[in-house]
Amino acid sequence: MEAKDKLAHRIKHLCKKNHISYYTLSYKSAVPMTTLMHIINCSTKNPGVFTIFKICNGLNITIKDFFDSEEFTDIEYEEY
């Protein structure tokens, strides 16, 4: 699984766990709904650390908490 897929999966999981809709997350994090949906649908290759930071704020978690998951232990890095 690629990093962008893992990001999408983690956001979906945290929204479900916290009973928060994507719309609510978009509002709370000040990330436009279209941007959030591009991340969730994996059409954004690299959402950027600041966007992930804002999403974490919307979820009331730290970036460390976001990435502190089994799914991020074996990320495949792409060379550009």
Which stretches of residues belong to each language-model region?
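DNA major-groove recognition helix of helix-turn-helix
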Residues: C15, I40, T51
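Short, basic-rich loop-to-helix N-cap that marks the start of a DNA-contacting helix
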Residues: S43-K54
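The DNA-recognition helices of helix-turn-helix-type DNA-binding domains
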Residues: P32, S43, E70-D74
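A short, Lys/Arg-rich alpha-helix, primarily the initiator
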Residues: M1-I20
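Short alpha-helical DNA-recognition segment
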Residues: H19-H38
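The alpha-helix within a helix-turn-helix
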Residues: C15, S26, C56
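Short, charged recognition helix plus adjacent turn
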Residues: H13, H38, F67-Y80
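Residues within the helices of the helix-turn-helix
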Residues: K12, Y23, F53
